Amino acid sequence: GIIDVIQLHGDEDADFIRRLRELTSAPIIKAAKIRTPEDIGRVQALGADYVLLDNGTGTGEMFDHSLLDGAEIRQPFFLAGGLTPENLRQAAESVRPYCVDLSSGVETDRLKDREKMLEAVRVIREL
């Protein structure tokens, strides 16, 4: 199809995701702001194929990864929020995400920085 994957960052509910599935077979990623352990359960209940766990503030800061301790995360999850080449290894090893989402952590002056991106890829390949 024309859409390969759908990533939702709004207030979409389970009914919205169900209706979206009727229109496309593309995998759905639902992003969530993680402030409490209950936030993890709420996003999982929406029925997306993947969940993206994020600080959600756009500040380049990580959320408290200890909120994931003991959490039963059923869907494969993406880890986002404040990840940089310098903290990527520790974050990935501690929470074991399916995937990582990098943005401002690989930028210099709000532009993607080739060297930072290459360093992040090197770190991931070493895991």
Task: Give the label of every model feature segment.
Residues 1-89:
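Conserved anion-binding
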Residues 19, 68, 72, 92, ...:
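C-terminal helical cap(s) of enzyme catalytic domains, especially alpha/beta-barrels
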Residues 89-97:
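Short glycine/proline-rich, acidic loop/turn segments that cap or connect secondary-structure elements
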Residues 78-80, 99-103:
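Conserved active-site loop/cleft motifs that coordinate metal ions or position small ligands
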